[in-house]
């Protein structure tokens, strides 16, 4: 039929037998013309529909668009001309074939369609159509045959159809021009990422990334150089898609979980029924015990399962499908190579075959390899981006869950464990996603390999398959063991990171008590277990590697042996051998990768379980908190009962309470009565038992322990709200922050560090209050905000913020307070006891009622006046039953004596006192400066010296220094390195030997052609080939074992050095370095050194030697190939140099941008109640998304850089294959089939090996960055040695005499002095009180005594010994401190008291008795073994402070420092601590940093500090008599003489004798 259509022959059946490759003209004019046209017309409707759906605003006409349209227009004109020529041809000639009419008409219509498509693309972001590019490529390729036919026809006959030929040549040229134009992309200003607008050719070759690589080569890349990720990869887009499917799948999983629970319940019921009339069986007891343990630990083995993987699949199924198709095409094309190799060997072996066939085979080899490269790299790009998306999804979802998780579920996880979910577990899922298709792909490749091997060798291949099958269960057993080891290791890692988190959080306490060695041992012990598992895992992996490496060798040896042994006529020739070897090489990859993928999947399954358990945990149930904007009351409790744990009794019980809008309500009660729980219930932080709470309007919350974000003071106060300068200034003034801003460098733009590390407790609390005040909410929940400020500041804040005339006047305020003198000014008082409301009413009504509140209040006033210490009302309180004077009495009490839970706060004490005459002028000046600052934020270079407390994370640039590699190699050990290299070299020798031996074996087919093959020769060939194969496996096993041992040793050394150095770093390092940044070294970087780096080093060594071996073998066969290697090597090296510079820096950027994600997460978890109260979850989610997107743009860029490199390397590899094949064709007369097979079978491997080599080079350099980052912290400057040769005498200090001589100190070299020439003598057993405002130098004095700060000048001597001359532990171990913040660590109570086990149980119990904790600890279930949780939430602040007192009592050193030790405790606890100190430390030198003047009035001497100088120093009597700063402070506190302070002793006696009821400490 087609013959008639063309009037010529359609197909020539003897084409392959002709000396010239010439397709029939009819075939060229029909099939080769129609293929591209059919492709275009089939896809055009779908393309136009897609354009219609995704169209955006039409872009302006560009030169590219015009050029392409003009060229297509020219093609249209040429088609018209051709049609006219056909129609006007001489009718006298022979009949014109139909094809001459149809082709121009088809082209005419097609070019019109192309014009339409190109025009429609102008309304899309992507102007170039990928399918149009494919059409042009197909059209040009198909036209090539017609092009060469016309050329040859014209050369034979110059007048043959010249016009038609010219039209074709012009059309062909235009098509090439259009394809060239299509390779360039038209820029779109709406897109920041060029990948969005990149052309098809640019995308498949990753050429759009060239500019980044060039930039990275010229200079180190910065974050600004990296393009933003495309919208589809952003966290918000991905998570929104993920959550839709997650909701459905989680719902199904929960139903399945409930069914499992019901079945278990029924089974247990039956079990109990069987044992009803018998004593409980052992099994039931064990079951019950297990339940108890699970309940206690907060963990359950069962939870909603198997939903996460389904959700991920449903979210990303399109990417999975596309990547599946690409991998399928790649795998199928892989099996064309052995067939082409076979054809080439046949071609060389047959001297009669035509040369053009050889060239066609060589070109086909190159074409197949090129298509494979495009498919593989696009596949990898998709999969790695998918992995990145999965990682993004996990991190964002875990963060979002953390914002909604219930408190009960949250308690099951430490912060370290949750961070691990975001880092380690997310990474495991990313890794497995990258190679998920290898599961089915490996199976497909194995099956196809076996099939093609059967075709070559027949049933003999079954012997090889049998070997593979036998090894499957072995690999399965090893994989299972590896999973268990991995699971254990994750637990050890979690524990280690938890301890590290605590160490870093409580570093100052460790240094004060010289406890670093104890905690170092704890970490080392866990690390030993971790490394033991790591070694076992590495050894198991070595065995797996050995089996994987040996399997293809065993299979090939077995198969070849059986093939030649079963039939004497079976002789192994080059065709069979090298085709089979190529198939065995194909088989090697899936065989080696499948167990790795299975192992990765097993590891990922552990992570999936952990993530499913966390993400399926219960959310905070706020259904009991009803918000009604039209409600007539501000807050209403209706029969409300709430609990922290449903397994425990309710903490808040049957509360009925109405609070009207605008009221100021004080909540008072005993310690542990439920005041804070009542506030938490209102915030929805507790589990509802029954009843509900109705709230009208928005809430703001000030927690008891202030939560400060790492940022500026201004950011903390604004808390995401719009900046209103007038309100902002009012808030600063009302919260008494203006004087503090004057002290701080940079004012409100000063960075205040992680957790507000460089602020006092009072400053943090006032910033917390300012944050709430600025928000302009309807209801303010204030949990004891005045506890951290002194009396004058408290009064100022109450009057200016909380009180009737304060900033929040008109707002509803619930105030938990311990300050009696404010109670008369509140609208209502709520008295809480044991979770219930005892009384409620106004101050006067409660007094009139004469209930618990009035009774305790009168008792307080009576005992105060009975001693005659405080005279406030001229005898108006004589009648005990008369309440009329109580209001005035309470109002006129000296605040310093009534405020029962005060914390250090002297900054405003000074600035608000009468001694500050210039206060007004300074405040005005500061306001003006703040206005200037808020109007225009200073640039970074304008920031005041010392303003930026948190240093920007240091990032190396350029090549990783050789010293880093050297450090790692030294850590491995030079003996191990030599052994590893030697083993791998032997492996390469065995590899070359086995190939040469196989080549010699196949040449036997020529030697013994037609004759009997000697059995001895056959056996020799088999034996040596088998020995060489076994040698390859054994050398890999030895190298892997040696490497595993050496790398584990290196990991141990680096971790040990890092830990030792971090523990020895000065406090200034921790003050300027966020904890998350340090933890990242112990988590991510150590994990890289443990797992990834050893693997990449091993792979690099194997790839490098494999390439050298292959090139040696090719050059041995064809020496001329050495000439081609040189230019290819230059290209290879150039590409690598360009790539490595970029990749290395991108990896560094990845590390630097990852730390803030974890820091932000840790910060969020610690401030959850505040974030929820302000309803700022969405803002924090957005911040997290921005952080993730910033990190992921570095990851995405790194992924693209890998693909950019791989494509170019594979191109080099493909050129090696093409060059080798070309050489075989050119020199076929001098080569034999076995040489061709030998060369090409190895050349086919080089593409993949080259790719892996550069990837491993990059991976190694990328991963060695972890060693670089660890080394950075190993090199951190240490504080002084813990122990020196000069040690103090035994029993030192025996007196406790301290002398400061012209002592000067500064916090950091670039900062000013904080102590400026301190001179004073403290005699033995003296009691010294130290006072002064914030910034005066009080805490600095303490830090100097412990050498937390080192002297900038002068010296301190204790008992005649200069403390700078002895070791830090010799010094700190002999001093004792009770710090302001009572820090405890996870572990037992005993460990917290005595981490070194230096004391007996009797001594510890005695210390607890003196600390008034014996009965409490004895009453605990496990006594001294009772575990303290990470957040210390199972002990009150008072109990923690008493434990700190217990530490001091155990030490019983001659010098005791009280750094505002009773600042955060109530009167009872304060009294207990003060009494114990007076009794037990009477023979010691005691230095007290004062928060209340009354506590230091019985001191021998008072030291008044101001601006780093001692302004007064003398006995209290002397200082009160002089008209100095201390005298003014005392008068303001109501102290006129030393005897005035007897109030405290009286109150203490009453409380101790039981004459004061517990309410005394609570009506506060």
UniProtKB/Swiss-Prot annotation:
SMART domains: AAA. Residues 258-267 have a biased composition (Basic residues). Residues 268-283 have a biased composition (Polar residues). It catalyses: an S-substituted glutathione(in) + ATP + H2O = an S-substituted glutathione(out) + ADP + phosphate + H(+); ATP + H2O + xenobioticSide 1 = ADP + phosphate + xenobioticSide 2; taurolithocholate 3-sulfate(in) + ATP + H2O = taurolithocholate 3-sulfate(out) + ADP + phosphate + H(+); leukotriene C4(in) + ATP + H2O = leukotriene C4(out) + ADP + phosphate + H(+). Residues 49-68, 115-126, 187-311, 380-435, 481-542, 607-969, 1053-1095, 1139-1209, 1254-1543 are cytoplasmic. The gene is ABCC2. Belongs to the ABC transporter superfamily. ABCC family. Conjugate transporter (TC 3.A.1.208) subfamily. It is an enzyme of class 7 (translocase). Expressed in liver, kidney and small intestine. One of its GO terms (molecular function) is ABC-type xenobiotic transporter activity. This is ATP-binding cassette sub-family C member 2. GO terms for cellular component: apical plasma membrane. Residues 258-283, 909-939 are annotated as: Disordered. The keyword tRNA processing does not apply. GO terms for biological process: bile acid and bile salt transport; leukotriene transport. It comes from Oryctolagus cuniculus (Rabbit). The chain crosses the membrane at residues 28-48, 69-89, 94-114, 127-147, 166-186, 312-332, 359-379, 436-456, 460-480, 543-563, 586-606, 970-990, 1032-1052, 1096-1116, 1118-1138, 1210-1230, 1233-1253. Residues 1-27, 90-93, 148-165, 333-358, 457-459, 564-585, 991-1031, 1117, 1231-1232 are extracellular. ATP 2 binds at residues 1332-1339. It holds the Pfam family ABC_tran. PROSITE patterns: ABC_TM1F, ABC_TRANSPORTER_1, ABC_TRANSPORTER_2. Glycans are attached at residues 7, 12, 1009. Residues 909-918 have a biased composition (Low complexity).
């Amino acid at each position: 039929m087609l013959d008639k259509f063309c009037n010529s022959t359609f197909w020539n059946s003897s084409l392959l037998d002709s000396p010239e490759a010439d397709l029939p003209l009819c075939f060229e004019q029909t099939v080769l013309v129609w293929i591209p046209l059919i492709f275009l017309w089939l896809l055009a409707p779908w393309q136009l529909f897609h354009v219609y759906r995704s169209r955006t605003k039409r872009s302006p006409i560009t030169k590219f668009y015009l050029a392409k349209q003009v060229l297509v227009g020219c093609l249209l004109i040429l088609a018209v001309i051709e049609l006219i020529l056909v129609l006007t041809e001489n009718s006298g000639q022979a009949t014109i074939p139909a094809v001459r009419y149809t082709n121009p008409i088809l082209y005419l219509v097609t070019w019109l369609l192309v014009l339409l498509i190109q025009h429609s693309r102008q309304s899309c972001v992507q102007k170039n159509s990928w399918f149009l590019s494919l059409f042009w490529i197909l059209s040009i390729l198909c036209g090539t045959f017609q092009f060469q036919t016309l050329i040859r026809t014209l050369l034979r006959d110059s007048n043959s159809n010249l016009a038609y030929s010219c039209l074709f040549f012009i059309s062909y040229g235009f098509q090439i021009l259009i394809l060239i134009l299509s390779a360039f992309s038209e820029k779109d200003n709406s897109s920041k990422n060029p990948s969005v607008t990149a052309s098809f050719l640019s995308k498949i070759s990753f050429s759009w990334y060239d500019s980044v690589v060039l930039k990275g080569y010229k200079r180190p890349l910065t974050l600004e150089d990296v393009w933003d990720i495309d919208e589809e990869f952003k966290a918000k887009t991905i998570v929104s898609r993920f959550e839709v499917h997650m909701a459905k799948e989680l719902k199904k999983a929960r139903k399945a979980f409930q069914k499992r629970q019901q079945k278990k319940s029924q089974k247990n019921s039956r079990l109990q029924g069987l044992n009803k009339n018998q004593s409980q069986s052992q099994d039931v007891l064990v079951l019950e015990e297990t339940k108890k343990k699970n309940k206690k630990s907060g963990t359950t083995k069962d939870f909603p399962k198997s939903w996460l993987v389904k959700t991920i699949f449903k979210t990303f199924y399109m990417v999975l499908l596309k990547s599946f198709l690409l991998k399928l095409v790649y795998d199928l094309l892989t099996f064309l190579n052995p067939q082409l190799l076979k054809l080439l060997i046949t071609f060389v072996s047959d001297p009669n075959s035509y040369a053009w066939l050889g060239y066609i085979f060589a070109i086909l080899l190159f074409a197949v390899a090129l298509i494979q490269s495009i498919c593989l790299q696009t596949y990898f790009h998709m999969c790695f981006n998918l992995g990145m998306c999965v990682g993004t999804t996990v991190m964002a979802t875990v963060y979002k869950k953390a914002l909604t998780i219930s408190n009960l579920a949250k308690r099951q996880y430490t912060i370290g464990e949750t961070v691990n979910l975001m880092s380690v577990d997310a990474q495991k899922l990313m890794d497995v996603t990258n190679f998920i298709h290898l599961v089915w792909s490996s199976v497909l490749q194995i099956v196809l390999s076996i099939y093609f091997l059967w075709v070559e060798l027949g049933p003999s291949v079954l012997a090889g398959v049998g070997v593979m099958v036998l090894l499957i269960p072995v690999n399965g057993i090893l994989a299972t063991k590896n999973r268990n080891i991995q699971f254990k290791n994750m637990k050890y890692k979690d524990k280690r990171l938890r301890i590290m988190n605590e160490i870093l959080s409580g570093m100052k306490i460790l240094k004060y008590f010289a406890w670093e060695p104890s905690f170092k041992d704890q970490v080392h012990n866990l690390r030993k277990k971790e490394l033991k598992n790591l070694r076992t895992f590495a050894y198991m992996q070595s065995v797996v590697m050995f089996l994987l490496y040996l399997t293809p060798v065993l299979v090939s040896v077995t198969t070849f042996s059986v093939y030649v042994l079963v039939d004497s006529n079976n002789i192994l020739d080059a065709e069979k051998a090298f085709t089979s070897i190529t198939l065995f090489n194909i088989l090697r990859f899936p065989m080696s990768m499948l167990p790795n993928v299975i192992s990765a999947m097993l590891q990922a399954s552990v992570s999936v379980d952990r993530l499913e358990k966390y993400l399926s945990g219960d959310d905070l149930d706020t259904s009991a908190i009803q918000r009604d904007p039209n409600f007539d009351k501000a807050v209403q409790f209706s029969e409300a009962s709430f609990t922290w744990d449903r397994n425990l009794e309710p903490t808040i019980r049957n509360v009925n309470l109405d609070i009207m809008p605008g009221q100021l309500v004080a909540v008072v009660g005993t310690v542990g009565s439920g005041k804070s729980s009542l506030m938490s219930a209102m915030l929805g932080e507790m589990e509802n038992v029954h009843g509900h709470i109705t709230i009208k309007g928005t809430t703001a919350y000030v927690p008891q322990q202030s939560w400060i974000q790492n940022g500026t003071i201004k950011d903390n106060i604004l808390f995401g709200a719009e900046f209103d300068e007038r309100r902002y200034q009012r808030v600063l003034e009302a919260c008494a922050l203006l004087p503090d801003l004057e002290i701080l460098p940079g004012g409100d733009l000063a960075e205040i560090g992680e957790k507000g590390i460089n602020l006092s407790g009072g400053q943090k609390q006032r910033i917390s209050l300012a944050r709430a005040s600025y928000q302009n909410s309807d209801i303010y929940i204030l949990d004891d905000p005045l506890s951290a400020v002194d009396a004058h500041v408290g009064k100022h804040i109450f009057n200016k913020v909380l009180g009737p005339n304060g900033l929040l006047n008109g707002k509803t305020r619930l105030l938990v307070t311990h300050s009696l003198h404010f109670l008369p000014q509140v609208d209502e008082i709520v008295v809480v006891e044991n979770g219930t409301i005892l009384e409620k009413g106004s101050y006067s009504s409660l007094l009139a009622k004469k209930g618990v509140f009035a009774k305790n209040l009168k008792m307080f006033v009576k005992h105060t006046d009975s001693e005659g210490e405080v005279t406030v009302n001229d005898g108006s309180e004589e009648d005990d039953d008369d309440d009329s004077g109580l209001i005035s009495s309470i109002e006129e009490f000296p605040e310093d004596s009534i405020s029962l839970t005060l914390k250090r706060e002297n900054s405003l004490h000074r600035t608000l006192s009468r001694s500050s005459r210039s206060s007004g002028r300074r405040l005005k000046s500061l306001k003006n400066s703040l206005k200037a600052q808020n109007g225009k934020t200073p640039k970074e270079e304008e920031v005041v010296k010392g303003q930026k407390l948190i240093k920007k994370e240091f990032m190396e640039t350029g090549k990783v220094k050789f010293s880093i590699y050297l450090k790692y190699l030294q850590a491995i050990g030079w003996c191990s390195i030599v052994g590893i290299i030697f083993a791998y070299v032997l492996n390469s020798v065995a590899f070359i030997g086995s190939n040469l031996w196989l080549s010699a074996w196949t040449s036997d087919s020529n030697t013994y052609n037609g004759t009997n093959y000697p059995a001895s020769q056959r056996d020799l060939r088999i034996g040596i080939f088998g020995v060489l194969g076994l040698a390859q496996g054994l050398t890999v096993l030895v190298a892997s074992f040696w490497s595993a041992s050496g790398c584990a040793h290196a990991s141990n050394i680096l971790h040990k050095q890092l830990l030792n150095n971090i523990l020895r770093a000065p406090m200034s390092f921790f003050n300027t370095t966020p904890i998350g940044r340090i933890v990242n070294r112990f988590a991510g970087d150590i994990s890289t050194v443990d797992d990834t780096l050893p693997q990449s080093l091993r792979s690099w060594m194997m790839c490098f030697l494999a390439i050298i071996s292959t090139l040696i073998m090719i050059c041995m066969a064809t020496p001329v190939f050495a000439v081609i290697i040189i230019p290819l090597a230059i290209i290879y090296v150039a590409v690598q140099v360009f790539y490595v510079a970029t990749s290395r820096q991108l990896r560094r950027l990845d590390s630097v941008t990852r730390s803030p994600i974890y820091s932000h997460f840790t910060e969020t978890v610690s401030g959850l109640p505040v974030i929820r109260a302000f309803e700022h979850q969405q803002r924090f989610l957005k911040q997290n998304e921005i952080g993730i997107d910033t990190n992921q743009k570095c990851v995405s860029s790194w992924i693209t850089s890998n693909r950019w490199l791989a494509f170019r390397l594979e191109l080099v590899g493909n050129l090696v294959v093409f060059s080798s094949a070309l050489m075989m064709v050119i020199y076929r007369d001098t080569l034999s089939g076995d040489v061709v097979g030998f060369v090409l079978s190895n050349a086919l491997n080089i593409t993949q090996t080259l790719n892996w080599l550069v990837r491993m080079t990059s991976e190694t350099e990328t991963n060695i960055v972890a060693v670089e980052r660890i080394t950075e912290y190993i090199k951190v400057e240490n504080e002084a040695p813990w122990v020196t040769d000069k040690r103090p005498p035994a029993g030192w200090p025996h007196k406790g005499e301290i002398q400061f001589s012209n002592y000067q100190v500064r916090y950091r070299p670039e900062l000013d002095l904080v102590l400026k020439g301190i001179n004073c003598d403290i005699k033995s057993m003296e009691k010294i009180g130290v006072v002064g405002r914030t910034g005066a130098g009080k805490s600095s004095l303490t830090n100097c005594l412990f050498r937390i700060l080192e002297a900038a000048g002068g010296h301190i001597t204790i008992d005649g010994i200069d403390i700078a001359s002895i070791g830090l532990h010799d010094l700190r171990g002999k001093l004792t401190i009770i710090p302001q913040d009572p820090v405890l660590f996870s572990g037992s109570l005993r460990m917290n008291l005595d981490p070194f086990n230096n004391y007996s149980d009797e001594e510890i119990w005695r210390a607890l008795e003196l600390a008034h904790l014996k009965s409490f600890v004895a009453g605990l279930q496990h006594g001294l073994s009772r575990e303290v949780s990470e957040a210390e939430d199972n002990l009150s602040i008072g109990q923690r402070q008493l434990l700190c007192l217990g530490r001091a009592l155990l030490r019983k050193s001659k010098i005791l420092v009280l750094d505002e030790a009773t600042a955060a405790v109530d009167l009872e606890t304060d009294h207990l601590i003060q009494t114990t100190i007076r009794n037990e430390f009477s023979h010691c030198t005691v230095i007290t940093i004062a928060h209340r003047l009354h506590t230091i009035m019985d001191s021998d001497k008072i030291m008044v500090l101001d601006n780093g100088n001692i302004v007064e120093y003398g006995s209290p009597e002397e200082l009160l008599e002089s008209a100095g700063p201390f005298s003014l402070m005392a008068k303001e506190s109501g102290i006129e003489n030393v005897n005035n302070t007897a109030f405290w002793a009286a109150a203490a006696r009453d409380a101790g004798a039981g004459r004061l009821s517990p309410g005394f400490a609570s009506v506060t």
